[in-house]
Amino acid sequence: DDFDIIILELSSFQLELIDEFRADISVLLNVFEDHNERYGSYEVYQKTKTKIFLNQRNSDYAVFDDFYLSEKILKGINPLPKHVLFKDNEFNDLGNKISQNGIIKKFLPALIKVTDILDVDRNFVINQLKKFKNLNHRIYEVCSKNGVSFINDSKATNPAAANFAASQFKDIYWILGGLSKNNDLTKLNLSNKNIKKIFLIGSSSDQLSQIIPKKVKFEVSHNLENATRSAYKEVLKNQKGCILLSPGCSSQDQFIDYQERGNKFTKIVNNLVVKC
């Protein structure tokens, strides 16, 4: 009762439990294959995500990529709230003016649509976005020194998220692997021309080693500390590069969660690089 607006980020696990929950404005962002060990197929996972629209009224709003309308994933939801569609490349020019931050540009269309519904001044939105800093474990720069950057993207627990992170950098020394969750790891873009070397960790190492293209250098590092230290040695040889922890897999084979994994990476980096 003390707030005018409450913003909730809901996982598929939480959406499974929806009974009476109703959103005035619901937003469906990117839905890529994940949690196959739980749902068995991408289609079931996708359908679970659409539960965010349940219980909405005709006067409410559903904000989603127009791709989902063509895929008919809203079929069966009745009554259907007002549609507010966006496209991935919508507001590209505005995004380039605001920031080179890939996360901002990726989600700007949905954000603009929601703030327009709420009648928030566009200039206010733009000014706030210019101040935006990535959250920890989400393409977060731990350190940058002497041409070497360390990026903590431990939250990237599926191939699509890892691919997005890797698309943001050049001269990448990529720390990859963990618990696959039965996801299709062949969807990882391991032919990315900016990859210098891949360092494999966790239980998916053997599986990943079988699908890495022959032209791409890699080593099986087994654990995060070995991978980070080995990547640092490699990047120092070239005197520039990005050591990217974006595992594309869950962390529970070696860690409690992605946060513990990301914090471990940060600690290793701080021990490696003095006065970063």
Regions found by a protein language model. Name each.
Residues 2-86, 90-99, 251-259:
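Flexible active-site lid/hinge loop adjacent to a nucleotide/diphosphate
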Residues 9, 29, 45, 83, ...:
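Residue-level signal for inorganic ion chemistry
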Residues 62-66, 175-176, 194-203:
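Short internal beta-strands
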Residues 67-74, 181-184, 204-210:
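Short, charged/polar "capping" segments at the starts of alpha-helices
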Residues 78-91, 126-130, 140, 218-225:
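Beta-strand->loop->alpha-helix junctions that form or flank phosphate-binding loops
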Residues 100-195:
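Nucleotide phosphate-binding/pyrophosphate-handling subdomain across enzymes
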Residues 185-242:
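C-terminal helical cap/extension that packs against the catalytic core
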Residues 248-275:
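Glycine/aspartate-rich loop-and-adjacent alpha/beta segment that forms the canonical ThDP
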